[in-house]
Amino acid sequence: MTKFVGCIDLHDGQVKQIVGGTLKDNDDSLETNFVSKYPPSYYAQLYLENRIEGCHVIKLGPNNDAAAMEALNAAPGFLQVGGGINDENCLQWLEKASKIIVTSWLFTKEGTFLMDRLQLLSNKCGPDRIVVDLSCRRTPDSKWVVAMNKWQTLTTLELNKETFTELSKYTDEFLIHAADVEGLCKGIETDLVTKLYEWTKDINKEVKIVYAGGAKSISDLELVDKLSNGTVDLTYGSSLDIFGGKLVRFQDCCEWNSKHN
């Protein structure tokens, strides 16, 4: 059954909601939907108190380590953390995080996927402590390709059945941001959600999939549940009232999870 999963997006040490496609090294082009008056620990405790499991803390760029650690310290062993994770710092973050989320370190600067790095990380941390972030963009020929470097660089890794089958040997969970619709609150990428189910349904082990991007209504939980046969979980961001949104109530998301536990 599809569940609601929470997020804490950090930019320059603050909890923010950002239009994903505008996130670049130069902040002049950044479009921000929301900057919270609350510290990261507030959201960590909120998710913990409501038992919203599998929530992730994402460090978007530099100057976020202290803020991320504040969130993790407020809910030790409960939250996942991503952003700048590599083989040298992974175990340090896992002292307080339930799982690490890894993306850019698995690729060369040009965007070539390095399977040996995932194998190394899996051996070091265990596949059950790793989330592989396969956040992606749709190409003109309707393929879904993993994007890195704040979702600005398209990599050589295409999302398909073969990719998920191979990577699932080294991880139990995938996080997929649909970068083209992230932060727009104009609806989820239904094609992608359907594909995520089709690509992973025959994997011979239990794999968790979390989708983020564009969710704008509480009914999107039901939609994702239908499209994915209950195998894909859903994250809300800018549409959620706890992030300044007016479209979705956090309490309704909590009630959905309780009802479908």
Swiss-Prot record:
Its main location: cytoplasm. GO terms for cellular component: cytoplasm. CDD domains: HisA_HisF. Keywords: Amino-acid biosynthesis, Cytoplasm, Histidine biosynthesis, Isomerase. Its EC number is 5.3.1.16. It is an enzyme of class 5 (isomerase). Gene3D superfamilies: Aldolase class I. It is found in: Cytoplasm. It comes from the Eukaryota. It catalyses: 1-(5-phospho-beta-D-ribosyl)-5-[(5-phospho-beta-D-ribosylamino)methylideneamino]imidazole-4-carboxamide = 5-[(5-phospho-1-deoxy-D-ribulos-1-ylimino)methylamino]-1-(5-phospho-beta-D-ribosyl)imidazole-4-carboxamide. SUPFAM superfamilies: Ribulose-phoshate binding barrel. Pathway: Amino-acid biosynthesis; L-histidine biosynthesis; L-histidine from 5-phospho-alpha-D-ribose 1-diphosphate: step 4/9. GO terms for biological process: L-histidine biosynthetic process; L-tryptophan biosynthetic process. One of its GO terms (molecular function) is 1-(5-phosphoribosyl)-5-[(5-phosphoribosylamino)methylideneamino]imidazole-4-carboxamide isomerase activity. Belongs to the HisA/HisF family. NCBIfam families: hisA_euk (TIGR02129). This is 1-(5-phosphoribosyl)-5-[(5-phosphoribosylamino)methylideneamino] imidazole-4-carboxamide isomerase. It comes from Candida glabrata (strain ATCC 2001 / BCRC 20586 / JCM 3761 / NBRC 0622 / NRRL Y-65 / CBS 138). The gene is HIS6.
